[in-house]
A protein has these predicted regions:
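Catalytic cores of nucleotide-sugar-dependent glycosyltransferases that transfer UDP/GDP/TDP-activated
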Residues: 1, 31-32, 45-47, 116-118
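Intrinsically disordered, low-complexity regulatory regions of eukaryotic regulatory proteins
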Residues: 6, 53-56, 95
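Donor nucleotide-sugar recognition loop
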Residues: 24-28, 35, 39-79
Length: 126
């Protein structure tokens, strides 16, 4: 099962009691970005994922490949099923999710091992 964007699938004993650890990707709600690093290294959000399913994962995976890190902090965010785009986009949501996950896989399938290694090494520093 894919773990990009799904923090509860990280069940590593070394991370179990931590409020922060490095992950492949985080969900944009909430997502904090360093503006200077974003502009210097990432430059843009990939709007080809519109209406905005997986663009957050794509940004995070790209960040790892550009030498940046992606961390997860327990901010108390609980729901990924209510509000936001889900209110107005119910008809396209399932289709767009499947389409964009396939696109994300094609974009990063050759980099998965590299990114996973970077995440693993970053977590060893905690």
């Amino acid at each position: 099962k894919e773990k990009w964007g799904y923090v509860d699938l990280y069940k590593d004993d070394l991370l179990e009691d931590k409020d922060f650890y490095f992950v492949h990707a985080v969900n944009r709600a909430p997502m904090l970005l360093n503006k200077k690093l974003f502009i210097e290294h990432l430059e843009h959000i990939d709007f080809s994922f519109a209406p905005f399913h997986c663009d957050d994962c794509e940004l995070c995976l790209r960040a790892w490949l550009y030498g940046l890190k992606v961390g997860w902090y327990n901010a108390g965010f609980k729901s990924m099923v209510a509000g936001g785009m889900r209110i107005w986009n119910k008809g396209l949501m399932g289709f767009q999710e499947i389409k964009n996950r396939g696109k994300l896989y094609e974009m990063y399938k050759s980099s998965l091992e590299e990114i996973t290694g970077l995440v693993t090494e970053a977590n060893k520093t905690l």
